[in-house]
A protein has these predicted regions:
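Gly/Ala-rich beta-loop-alpha elbow adjacent to hydrolase catalytic centers
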Residues: 68, 72, 76
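Short beta-to-alpha linker loops that shape the active-site pocket of alpha/beta-hydrolase fold enzymes
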Residues: 24-29
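Alpha/beta hydrolase fold serine-hydrolase catalytic domain that processes acyl esters and thioesters
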Residues: 55-63, 78-249
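Conserved catalytic-core motifs of eukaryotic protein kinase domains, centered on the activation segment
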Residues: 32-35, 108
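Alpha/beta-hydrolase active-site loop
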Residues: 36-57
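Short amphipathic alpha-helix adjacent to the substrate-entry channel of hydrolases
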Residues: 2-22
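Charged catalytic carboxylate motif
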Residues: 45, 74-75, 199
Length: 249
């Protein structure tokens, strides 16, 4: 919400730029209330909101920039996947992701007893505002999963779209684990001090590799900010973000 408000404030009055935002108050996952906000509650809420924009308000999908930060970035990716797989409506024209949480399984960091020492989850554990501790991770993952088994974080692309245990190219046509059929214009903002920085690189690579008969389908853009922690880099890189928005609005 803060990003959208700041973006609109800075773009106010500029010709050809977005002048309004639609913020979705979706159900949040909460400890001890697995019937209320656990997966797929937020995805269903986002889907209904998207249908409202298109079918009630009359917006065209190609004119929509779908944005999300952190877990909201995870939700934005899940919504694009659902729209692609179900074919109810076209995916939005553009996708803007700020420090998206895209590997809930933590497959990049390796098993807890013997983590990968070169993973940003290990290297950036002291530099990020979030922590790699098991307690912190479970405080977010358990409410999200609800009554689903932990294995869902590894094998469900709606939950962990860049899990290293998923085959990124298993099939050309949906449904599959890859990113064919996603928005053609994608911007990913990340910081080199983030725990999840390597996830964002994997996401950018997998999106760029989305192919049909070997032809690249995406013009992805992954934007790094030096020494910035989780969800803190977009203000530094606002001019570049603004430039991307102006090209794809």
């Amino acid at each position: 919400a803060a990003f959208c408000r700041d973006l609109l404030r800075r773009l106010e009055g500029e010709k050809g730029m977005p002048q309004r935002a639609f913020l979705v108050e979706y159900r949040l996952a909460r400890h001890g209330d697995y019937e209320h906000g656990s997966y797929p509650a937020a995805l269903l809420d986002a889907f209904v909101a998207y249908l409202y924009l298109i079918r009630t308000c009359g917006f065209r999908p190609e004119n929509i920039i779908l944005s999300g930060d952190s877990s909201g970035g995870n939700l934005a990716l899940a919504l694009c996947r659902y729209l692609r797989d179900e074919g109810v409506e076209n995916v939005p024209g553009s996708l803007l992701l700020l420090s998206p949480w895209c590997d809930v399984s933590r497959s990049h960091s390796g098993p807890l007893p013997a983590p990968n020492p070169f993973s940003t989850t290990v290297l950036n554990n002291q530099s990020d505002v979030i922590t790699a501790s098991l307690l912190y991770r479970n405080s977010a993952v358990c409410p999200l999963l609800g009554r689903l088994p932990a294995s869902e974080t590894y094998k469900n692309p709606y939950i962990s779209p860049v899990s290293l245990q998923l085959d990124a190219q298993s099939g050309v046509y949906p449904p599959h684990w890859g990113f064919c059929g996603f928005p053609r214009h994608v911007f990913i903002n990340t910081g080199r001090a983030e725990l999840n920085s390597e996830q964002h690189v994997t996401l950018a690579h997998r999106m760029a590799e989305g192919t049909v008969s070997g032809v690249p389908q995406y013009s992805g853009d992954c934007d790094y900010s030096e020494d910035r922690a989780h969800n803190m880099s977009w203000r530094d890189q606002f001019p570049r973000t603004k430039g991307w928005v102006s090209r794809h609005d």
